[in-house]
Amino acid sequence: MVRKIGRRARESSPSSTSSTLPADFSHSEMHRHIATSLAALTSSGPLPGLVVFDLDYTLWPLWVDTHVDSPLRRRGSDINKVYDRNGQPLSFFPHVPAIMLWLKRSGIPIAAASRTSAPTVARQALNGLFLVDDAHLLTSATDDDSPEKPSPAQSQPKVVKAIDLFDYQEIYPGSKITHFRKLHADSGIPYEDMIFFDDEYRNAEVGSKLGVHFVEVGHQGTDLGLVEKAIREWRAKKAARAKAEL
């Protein structure tokens, strides 16, 4: 396997305006906080037609063609974790599961656009990463106006496979322009209604050439603050276009 030099291609990538969460937050508390914050965002304006993620250093903190060795497999009932053949673990960045589950619950299609030279390994990761969708239970448990408590069956958290959250996958070497032209052709969604999260600024060309709203991801990966900021910026662009058309 060819090894890349250094931790990532662009260490100077800026950090996001991340919403700071207490260090001692449990998984459930963090999930609830993110779900509540994003629910407020849902009710405050329009939402994008498609949210697209790069994979390496955007959803997880490594290069799958460099830092892990195939095959990647889940162990037992582990959540948000797979291991390579040497026992090296891979997980999503902390906020990513709750963000992706919110997108799915909100009816916003999700796509992957990655130029990795190891697409099979990337799909092994997405197939092996299982997530717990318990945000709706956490919300109802703290809702004093709720007329009734959930039944025992409803109280069981739902476990979902990460790959099943993606409506579209463009995972292969090449240009992100090629990826997005395919996403546009397959989905019928206008470029200007797409938001793209990626850690490499060179891929901002999808914005200048196609009109996609590009969001550069910093060293912390995709997180709540970055998503909130991205949607607000996308809304501002949308409003400006509408005003210009009057």
Question: Where is each model-derived feature located?
Answer:
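Substrate-recognition "cap/lid" segment bordering the active-site pocket of phosphatases
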Residues: 118-192
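Catalytic phosphate/metal-binding cores of nucleic-acid and nucleotide-processing enzymes, i.e., regions
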Residues: 70-75, 89-90, 128-129, 202-205, ...
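Hydrophobic "anchor" residues
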Residues: 58-59
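Short coil/turn segments at secondary-structure boundaries
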Residues: 63-66, 115, 208-209
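Non-catalytic pre-domain segments flanking phosphatase-related domains
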Residues: 1-55, 66-71, 240-246
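Asp-based, Mg2+/Mn2+-dependent phosphohydrolase catalytic module
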Residues: 2-11, 38, 177-195, 200-246
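Substrate-recognition element of Asp-dependent hydrolases with the DxDx(T/V) motif
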Residues: 87, 91, 96-129, 169-171
